[in-house]
Amino acid sequence: VYRNGKSKANRCFVMIIKKNDASSNRIGISVSKKVGNSIVRHRVTRVIREVMRLHWKEIKSGYDIVIVARPSAKESDYGKFESAIFHLLNLHHLLLEDDDLE
């Protein structure tokens, strides 16, 4: 995914996507030591995972998605995480249209 994927970024995250041959999505989350100590890194990881879990059905299937947290992510709250992730999903055209849901 890192080598051949398409990358988009905003202040909090870098999102890299690549089409896969599966019918479902796979997600990877990377939070380096630059973001903070282990407590901060695990919090960032948990919040990213929760945002993706709650909105999983709104994302087109068949992609490998890697989310890399930037150091500015440690200062963000859940609302900023959610809007930043949706911004990147929208840039990658991965959000389903309203009529495609269900």
Write out the residue ranges for each language-model feature.
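Positively charged, solvent-exposed patches that mediate nucleic-acid binding
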Residues: 1-102
